[in-house]
Amino acid sequence: MKLSAALLAIAAFANVASAQDCDTPATVSGYSNSALPDPFTFNDGSPVTTAEDWECRRSQILALIQGYESGAAPPEPESVTGTASGNSLSVQVSYGGKSITFNNSITYPSGTAPAEGWPVIIAYEFPSLPIPSNVATLSFQNSAMGKQDSTSSRGQGLFYDLYGSSSNASAMTAWAWGVSRIIDAIESTPDAKLNPAAVGVTGCSRNGKGALMAGALEPRVALTLPQESGSGGDACWRLSRYEEQQGSQVQTATEIVGENCWFSAGFDQYVNNLDSLPYDHHLLAALVAPRGLISYANTDYVWLSGMSSFGCMTAAHAVYEALGVPENHGFEQVGGHSHCQWPSQLDGSLNAFINKFLLGQDVSTDYFESNNQFNGVTWSESQWINWETPTLN
């Protein structure tokens, strides 16, 4: 049986969490808050004051996101086998007497691979941002892993062939699981010539939502690059609702659950009572901390909920600040280009984050900018953030 690094990390933390009596319920009864929930307060109301506290709080947030919207992570597979052939990595996964195989095409840099392998960015379907020539690209067909045709495709795809169509894992959880299995295969397949310690993940639009979820759920992802993910991605549910109330036609939680199966079926019961959620997507992004994260937003498309993305990532940035690594989290928001079309003016921040987190270079990644074009809706930090940012040592 292959024990993945992720499972080892979870098991190691479980011992620490148990010693600290870290309570991680899937839901919290009686919660009500119209503002963005405090990252630095435990479920029981006590404060998060140390970096060790944050590890427990992070586990709480992870449990809540799985309990309310993404669905539970499945049991670990019994085996994961990778086979490298030419420009392809085949991944075979077995569990409960069943097996699935999925193939991933790879574009390699020219020349001889470093001893540790090439850094690699896993792109959902295909990359819509420019990946440097010294970084490999692995194209992951996430829609085959968990179909996203409509709500009627719930429970369909390779993931559900293995774990059953009744699994409450959302399509995005299935995709994140697929990313984890790719990393397992990279770790165990030296012939793939990819560095498992230098893995990024990216996607745009609906796949951008998935890329952020993968970065949050899989701790071996060194750099997360969601692009124009909007509501359900780097935008917060509460803030998107507010934008709609102010007259903007944006994607909201109530709309999104009727559009597709990106979230678990259980999320439906909360979308008309968002104040009952003891988290929002600033806390989803906070799960990535202290690893590298930069998200890209496009204000030309009101549907993407621009104020919500900016405000949500502003709130998430507080966690990076508390951990002493604000430069590890970036945000860039511009207009003047089509949806999922990359504007060259963003090359600087993208290359900086790739150079730092995948190539190990000592470069500045101090990028957090917006054009503040929010269709007439104003972001007011004091309206949404009513908590202080501590220093977590």
Swiss-Prot record:
<dbReference type="InterPro" id="IPR054579">
    <property type="entry name" value="GCE-like_dom"/>
</dbReference>
<feature type="disulfide bond">
    <location>
        <begin position="236"/>
        <end position="312"/>
    </location>
</feature>
<feature type="binding site">
    <location>
        <position position="251"/>
    </location>
    <ligand>
        <name>substrate</name>
    </ligand>
</feature>
<dbReference type="GO" id="GO:0005576">
    <property type="term" value="C:extracellular region"/>
</dbReference>
<keyword id="KW-0964">Secreted</keyword>
<feature type="glycosylation site" description="N-linked (GlcNAc...) asparagine">
    <location>
        <position position="168"/>
    </location>
</feature>
<feature type="disulfide bond">
    <location>
        <begin position="204"/>
        <end position="340"/>
    </location>
</feature>
<dbReference type="GO" id="GO:0046274">
    <property type="term" value="P:lignin catabolic process"/>
</dbReference>
<keyword id="KW-0378">Hydrolase</keyword>
<feature type="short sequence motif" description="GXSYXG catalytic site motif">
    <location>
        <begin position="203"/>
        <end position="208"/>
    </location>
</feature>
<keyword id="KW-1015">Disulfide bond</keyword>
<keyword id="KW-0325">Glycoprotein</keyword>
<feature type="signal peptide">
    <location>
        <begin position="1"/>
        <end position="19"/>
    </location>
</feature>
<feature type="modified residue" description="Pyrrolidone carboxylic acid">
    <location>
        <position position="20"/>
    </location>
</feature>
<keyword id="KW-0732">Signal</keyword>
<feature type="disulfide bond">
    <location>
        <begin position="22"/>
        <end position="56"/>
    </location>
</feature>
<dbReference type="GO" id="GO:0052689">
    <property type="term" value="F:carboxylic ester hydrolase activity"/>
</dbReference>
<feature type="glycosylation site" description="N-linked (GlcNAc...) asparagine">
    <location>
        <position position="103"/>
    </location>
</feature>
<comment type="function">
    <text>Glucuronoyl esterase which may play a significant role in biomass degradation, as it is considered to disconnect hemicellulose from lignin through the hydrolysis of the ester bond between 4-O-methyl-D-glucuronic acid residues of glucuronoxylans and aromatic alcohols of lignin.</text>
</comment>
<dbReference type="InterPro" id="IPR029058">
    <property type="entry name" value="AB_hydrolase_fold"/>
</dbReference>
<feature type="binding site">
    <location>
        <position position="209"/>
    </location>
    <ligand>
        <name>substrate</name>
    </ligand>
</feature>
<keyword id="KW-0873">Pyrrolidone carboxylic acid</keyword>
<feature type="active site" description="Proton donor/acceptor">
    <location>
        <position position="339"/>
    </location>
</feature>
<keyword id="KW-0719">Serine esterase</keyword>
<dbReference type="Pfam" id="PF22244">
    <property type="entry name" value="GCE_fung"/>
</dbReference>
<feature type="binding site">
    <location>
        <position position="259"/>
    </location>
    <ligand>
        <name>substrate</name>
    </ligand>
</feature>
<comment type="similarity">
    <text>Belongs to the carbohydrate esterase 15 (CE15) family.</text>
</comment>
<feature type="active site" description="Nucleophile">
    <location>
        <position position="205"/>
    </location>
</feature>
<protein>
    <recommendedName>
        <fullName>4-O-methyl-glucuronoyl methylesterase</fullName>
        <ecNumber>3.1.1.117</ecNumber>
    </recommendedName>
</protein>
<keyword id="KW-0439">Lignin degradation</keyword>
<feature type="binding site">
    <location>
        <position position="303"/>
    </location>
    <ligand>
        <name>substrate</name>
    </ligand>
</feature>
